[in-house]
Amino acid sequence: MNENTNMISAGASIAGRNKRYVLWFYLLNLIFAHFGASAFSDQAHKILDHSLNADKLLHGFNLEIFFEMLMRPEFGPEGAATHPAMWFAILFFLASLLFMPGVLLGYASDHRLPRDEFYRACGRNVWRSVRLFLFFIVIAGIVAGILLRVMNALVNAADKTSNERLPFFTQLIGALIIFLVLTAIRIWFDFAQIDVVLRDQHAVRKSIASGFRRTRRNFGRLLGSYVVIAIVALAVLAAGILLWHAVVPPSSVLGAFIVGQATLLLLLAARFWQRATAVAFYEQELAAPTVEEASLVSVFTAPAVP
């Protein structure tokens, strides 16, 4: 447990030294969200600017008035309002694939990474990151599909028993197992991407194999570290929702914006914290000699016995 705490602290230290990356990604997400929501905002303005019920959405949120606005012919097709948000979400994801190699290189550096090195790492690894993502989607999709089918079968079997609580607990335990398995796969591919970036590995499959071996050797510590950070993120989310309901009045748009954006910023920071912890694990393992290397060193450095 102490080793897990040390690695989590090391990851927090790395992420803290490079907190500008979190801020950059947050601002990029905020800008894309603004443009993505602009189409919906424009269509809503056309109706609310001439509606007596506008105050119920401007100084609060009335679900009935909201759905009434969506159903009015003047609002236009729903796709015209939602498609820009979808495309800007995809654009943010692609930007994350592009810039994450530079972030990982910055995390592994003991000094502030120059801008040209950051962008060089991004450009050199963009296609490798795409290939890693495709491998991740295939493997995680297959595993998640199998686990979901097994869980649904177990829940259906539990429904046929006389124990009324058994289906709920079966679904709860199944969801927890799926979360842990997908977290393990996420760790595996985080290590693979770190290996691609730090070793400048052209063959992505070699980094995937290397990431699998490193994850297997440190599985308990890595999974524990990622789960602890995920629990912290869940606590942040719960605190944000509680503050939203308990502190922010329904009429305060600014208060809701501040609490919501602060929560999203901290959730983004938690994911970067996980990445930094993986980099700390990777660097620690590189610094520590393997068992075979240690045995060879002891053989060649041992004094001769007369």
Task: Identify the function of each model-found stretch.
Residues 1-12, 16-79, 99, 168-204, ...:
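Juxtamembrane transition segments at transmembrane-helix termini in multipass membrane proteins
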Residues 42-47, 143-160, 243-247:
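Membrane-helix interface motif
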Residues 76-93, 116-141, 165-179:
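Alpha-helical membrane-spanning segments of integral membrane proteins, especially the hydrophobic core
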Residues 90-102, 141-146:
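Mid-bilayer segments of alpha-helical transmembrane spans in multi-pass integral membrane proteins
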Residues 94-124:
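Hydrophobic transmembrane alpha-helix segments characteristic of membrane transport
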Residues 126-134, 215-228:
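Loop-to-transmembrane boundary segments
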